[in-house]
From Swiss-Prot:
The keyword Protease applies. One of its GO terms (cellular component) is phagophore assembly site. Residues 1-38 are annotated as: Disordered. It catalyses: [protein]-C-terminal L-amino acid-glycyl-phosphatidylethanolamide + H2O = [protein]-C-terminal L-amino acid-glycine + a 1,2-diacyl-sn-glycero-3-phosphoethanolamine. This is Probable cysteine protease ATG4. InterPro entries: Papain-like_cys_pep_sf, Peptidase_C54, Peptidase_C54_cat. It is found in: Cytoplasm; Nucleus; Preautophagosomal structure. GO terms for molecular function: cysteine-type endopeptidase activity; protein-phosphatidylethanolamide deconjugating activity.
Length: 402
């Protein structure tokens, strides 16, 4: 079964919501006759459509530019068609149980999030999740960073020119890129993340890398993965193609610093973009484009049943967030199909303040991932979690509360 989320998430403006043009205000003495009134309405509709297509700011979606009023031959919105092509991973309920760890949060600590969510009907369809305190059968309340990371990965595979098999992202332990395996990889690592604990961007990046490496060892998954800490990209590490570059970033303290605004938009504008997993305070979102200073995103905080079909991985509905309201912690994805792509990326991002290109890495450098990169949201007192954020330094702090 497929859920239609258009009504919940649709925020794009219709022509009726756009500012009226001067032709909309026609004095009474020009409307005395019915024929002239109809002619005026016809002319108004023509000029309004023309005005909207000229004055509306262009919409940029993963390196391609569209006008908000653009329509295809069938009259469908070109922007919404492009949005629907993106892969959207969201909360799921009723999946294969993930056993609670004795040192981790309990499933019932997320009951409030399970009940008060954006798809209450899904909650009642999976009522057992409200009484099982031994197993996680939904990621509502804690899995949004994993879902947006899955979105980056799925869209990266698509951007690399390969068909995306959504079964690889199914919520079972046998699926290569499932939530179950994201949790397992992190749990088996020295970080020892537990089910129900939140992933930071650095941890999400490393988990994607390990899952892709494991999958490549047994089956032909097209992507290799490089994690580029601090936005540093080294020529001598770009060896195989296609390659997914993951950049765990922190671009400010409470909000994205103004100095990075244009550079951040550029990461969504280049044709190599795979999107950004990040968000606003208290949630992680999948950003795939922008219009003006408004970032366009797909929201993972919409629970769907695990049995929902292929259509549930797409939606033509999206929301907007002004860049000034964006949380500074995020993970950006860039896909390089070949060396020409890499050369083009370097040319397009000359002067970018986020990514930096180097000929070779100093191999005395190393990446240290802190245990605090995982935050336990199973605590009843969330203020303790919020207080912990202040103790993190700018390098290891990748904190968003789900």
């Amino acid at each position: 079964m497929t859920w239609d989320t258009k009504n919940q998430f649709e925020t794009t403006k219709t022509s009726q919501e756009l500012p009226a043009t001067s032709q909309d205000h026609i004095s009474d003495n020009k409307m005395n006759s019915e024929p002239s009134h109809r002619l005026s309405q016809f002319w108004s509709s023509l000029t309004r459509s023309s005005s909207e297509s000229i004055t509306a700011e262009p919409v940029v979606i993963l390196g391609h530019t569209y006008r908000e009023g653009d329509r295809d031959r069938e009259g469908d919105s070109e922007v919404q068609k492009q949005v629907k092509k993106r892969y959207w991973m969201s909360y799921r309920s009723g999946f294969e149980p993930i056993k609670k760890h004795e040192d981790g949060p309990s499933p019932l600590s997320f009951v409030q999030s399970m009940i008060f969510n954006k798809n209450v009907g899904n909650t009642f369809a999976n009522i057992h999740s409200l009484v099982d305190n031994d197993n996680f059968t939904t990621d509502v309340g804690w899995g949004c960073m994993i879902r947006t990371s899955q979105s980056v990965l799925a869209n990266a595979i698509d951007r690399a020119g390969y068909e995306v098999d959504v079964e690889l992202f199914a919520d079972t332990s046998s699926a290569a890129f499932s939530l179950h395996n994201f949790v397992k990889v992190a749990s088996d690592s020295p970080l020892r993340v537990r089910p129900g604990q939140w992933f930071g961007p650095s941890a999400a990046s490393l988990s994607i890398k390990r899952l892709c490496e494991a999958r490549n060892s047994s089956t032909n998954v097209p992507l290799s993965v490089l994690v580029c800490e601090s936005g540093d990209i080294y020529d001598d590490q770009i060896q195989t193609f296609p390659v997914l570059l993951l950049l765990p970033l922190r671009l400010g303290i409470d909000h994205v610093n103004n100095v990075y605004h244009s550079s951040l938009l550029q990461l969504l504008e280049v044709p190599q973009s795979a999107g950004i997993a990040g968000g606003k305070p208290s949630s992680s979102l999948y950003f795939f484009g922008y219009q003006g200073t408004s970032l366009l995103y797909l929201d993972p905080h919409y629970p769907q049943n695990v049995s929902a079909g292929v259509g549930s991985y797409h939606s033509s509905s999206y929301q907007k967030l002004d860049i000034s309201d964006m949380d500074p912690s995020m993970m950006a994805g860039i896909v390089l199909k070949n060396n020409e792509d890499y050369t083009d990326l370097k040319r397009r991002t000359t002067g970018n303040k986020i990514i930096h290109f180097h000929e070779a890495r100093n191999y005395n450098d190393y990446v240290e991932v802190e245990r605090e990169d995982f935050i336990d949201l199973g605590q009843n007192n969330r203020s303790a979690t919020a207080g912990a954020e202040a103790d993190f330094d700018s390098e290891s702090s990748m904190v968003i509360v789900d």
